[in-house]
Design a protein with these regions (language model features):
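A short, exposed loop/beta-hairpin motif centered on an aromatic-Gly-Thr core
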Residues: 25-34
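Short, charged, surface-exposed hinge/linker loops at domain edges
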Residues: 1-10, 39-75
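Short aromatic-glycine-(Arg/Gly/Cys) micro-motifs in beta-strand/loop hairpins
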Residues: 5-22
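Amphipathic alpha-helical interaction segments
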Residues: 15, 25-26, 56-57
Length: 75
């Protein structure tokens, strides 16, 4: 059975593309839809784990990522 791990995906629209970013590994990908961007990010993360050395994985891995929203007065 393959080992699995849960990662965060932050997806933003940029022009006609959707950019997906994984903050735990600082890896990003893109797609023409949210679904495609998410799929491409999953592929990029899987490829990273297939080819990166254990030390590179340890250096890039952020163990704690907090995603939150804030209310800021703007005017």
């Amino acid at each position: 059975m393959k080992k699995v791990r849960r990662f965060t995906a932050i997806i933003e629209k940029d022009g006609q593309w959707y950019v997906a970013h994984c903050p735990e590994l600082d890896i990003a990908s893109q797609g023409k839809s949210v679904k495609e961007a998410r799929k491409n990010l999953k592929e990029a993360i899987a490829l990273f784990f297939q080819h990166a050395s254990p030390s590179e994985i340890a250096n890039r891995m952020h163990s704690e990522v907090i995603v939150t929203q804030m209310v800021v007065p703007i005017g």
